[in-house]
Design a protein with these regions (language model features):
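Alpha-helical structural context detector biased toward long hydrophobic helices
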Residues: 1-5, 9-311
Length: 311
């Protein structure tokens, strides 16, 4: 069966922020107004993970294989749901005991890093980055062509063809010019992450960070968004997920927050890796502001009052 509405943030994740009717409060980052919506209607686009039909061979068109990325993501999400529930159950148990404890073991950390990597690469924000990049290349090529028109003696210029790589799906038979189509390029990126799983570069970076699981006992709920993984850079050392001193945060629910710390600057905390900590009100507020500033468009909350955060 063809799936029309495809999510770039899993519903099993959004459910942790929703009420029993699976409804969640939504706000656009450009306006303080909020509204209640079912999680099935947010963080999604029609056919977001479909390969464009014009890029498929006749054989694959007949098999309706344009949705293989969506199918793979759905299969992974079933495992992600179980892993997420395990972490929440563990944190609830630790919270009851009111003491810091190891939340997960090293093997589970590596396993969960793959889910985080997949979330990072599959969002609308990532799609936009690819679109901006391809537009910049197109603009540059046009300017160069215009320059050559006015300077005939200048040597011909062309962009090198990309080197083929193995993906999670056998792409033999596809007629894809990925370097010229941002959406297809993004789908290749998602597919590559699916294929490599915990062995992907992004997964390894996350697994190498120092993890703290924050418990929010304040009256302010943790927010999430259509780009749930956010980055807090250290001084001027860059905003990459492996930049020196960077902190990468991922809200698990209104009460729980995973914060990953780059392990060279934060090396003194290695002995506390994978343990729980209590979040202060300032920490919760700081994280919520990151969600608002780094979302693509929408912020999600378990409560209607987003308060003074969205300004």
């Amino acid at each position: 069966m063809t799936v029309k509405q495809q999510h770039f943030v899993p519903r099993c994740y959004l459910k942790n922020f929703a009420n029993p009717q699976e409804q969640i409060f939504v706000a656009d980052k450009d306006t303080p107004k909020s509204y209640l919506s079912n999680i099935k209607n947010i963080a999604k686009r029609n056919y977001f993970n479909d390969f464009p039909v014009e890029f498929l061979s006749d054989e694959y068109k007949k098999k309706e294989e344009s949705q293989f990325v969506e199918i793979c993501l759905s299969n992974v999400e079933n495992k992600f749901k179980i892993a997420l529930s395990h972490i929440i159950d563990r944190l609830e148990s630790i919270e009851t005991k009111e003491e810091s404890n190891e939340v997960i073991d090293k093997a589970f950390k590596s396993h969960f890093s793959f889910f985080l990597a997949l979330q990072l690469v599959r969002t609308m924000s990532q799609r936009q980055k690819f679109q901006n990049m391809m537009q910049d290349i197109s603009d540059l090529t046009s300017k160069f062509d215009d320059f050559r028109t006015r300077n005939q003696e200048y040597p011909e210029f062309s962009i090198p063809e990309p080197i083929n790589s193995n993906q999670s799906i056998n792409f033999n038979g596809f007629k894809v010019s990925a370097e010229k189509d941002a959406n297809v390029q993004h789908l290749f990126f998602i597919s590559d992450t699916l294929d490599k799983a915990s062995s992907s570069d992004i997964s390894k970076i996350f697994a190498n960070h120092i993890w703290f699981f924050g418990i929010n006992s304040t009256s302010i709920p943790l927010l999430t968004s259509d780009t749930p993984i956010v980055i807090k850079p250290y001084q001027n050392h860059g905003v990459g997920i492996d930049s020196y001193g960077v902190q990468v945060a991922y809200p698990i629910s209104p009460k729980y927050l995973l914060v990953m710390h780059e392990n060279s600057y934060w090396s003194d905390y290695k002995s506390f890796d994978r343990r729980s900590i209590n979040l202060t009100e300032n920490c919760v507020m700081s994280h919520n502001k990151l969600q608002i500033s780094q979302c693509h468009r929408q912020i999600y909350s378990s409560e209607k009052t987003f308060g003074s955060l969205i300004k």
